[in-house]
């Protein structure tokens, strides 16, 4: 009688799958085959593993489960951005977004913004995700499953579709689900899976200083983006409650340690809000980042019901950027995607929850 705990095959790397197959009485090479089917081809059920006999598939099904996320809703913006609401096995819902960037001379870039938690405990003032509180962490399989299931869906339209970039900027704080995020990165990077280069993945954090240091020591070759939003503790306390635990002084010290250990530039994100995108605010950011290995990404805020925040004018955005550039700070304004479908994280999930009340 098999008393092994049934595991999610999407959580397992090749070595773990090989070991698990051996424990199920299967040849070890089955581990590699299963990994390729699950992680590279993004299969949705065991019957799709065509080079594995029915008897072995039955053993796999008894010892492992393969349970894709179920699409609940999809919204498609005029610019082609797609927002997905998926349901997990326990009934919880999560969001992820597919953004296409046509680079013409190079290959097209297909970026997926993935969630790492159900809800979020950080409670940033301009974010819809935190309005419903934190429910639980996502497993590695649920994190990378967003990429796999989008890939599966898109290959119904284009058999050659391939995700090229990942940003951990969806629902949740990635560094508060640290081990699962790193495992998902490992699996997504495997050349026999999706084969996405680590330099094409970016983790965005609200400022969990100790985990920024740990990330520097563990040194996966991923990008780091820090949600800065203000150079004043009093303002940042209101925008990002995490700042009360890890204030700017501690955050910037951790960022300095990160760049020293990795020699990699950090992207500092500034959400621009009408009435707060002032020249004084820009100059304060410039002084804070002076001498840092840094790039600033300006993000005109998406209006979210329940936050009372509005977008700044184009002139405010331009003046903010020019002020930073005059201080020698590299700056860009985020290319807007999906504004007509509320593509900011948490909005579609919140809409569904409001409808069900």
Curated annotation (Swiss-Prot):
Entry GO terms, CC = cytoplasm
Name of the protein described by the UniProt record:
Probable dual-specificity RNA methyltransferase RlmN
Q: What is its EC number?
A: 2.1.1.192
What are the residue boundaries of the Radical SAM core domain, all occurrences included? 106-340
Q: Which family does it belong to?
A: Belongs to the radical SAM superfamily. RlmN family.
Describe its function.
Specifically methylates position 2 of adenine 2503 in 23S rRNA and position 2 of adenine 37 in tRNAs.
Cofactor(s) the record lists: [4Fe-4S] cluster
- Binding sites annotated in the UniProt record for S-adenosyl-L-methionine: 172-173, 204, 227-229, 302
Write out the catalytic residues in the record. Answer: 95 (proton acceptor), 345 (s-methylcysteine intermediate)
Binding residues annotated for [4Fe-4S] cluster, in chain numbering: 120, 124, 127
Say which enzyme class the record assigns.
transferase
SUPFAM superfamilies, per database record: Radical SAM enzymes
BP GO terms, sorted: rRNA base methylation; tRNA methylation
The answer to keyword S-adenosyl-L-methionine applying to this record is: yes
Cysteine-cysteine disulfides: 113-345
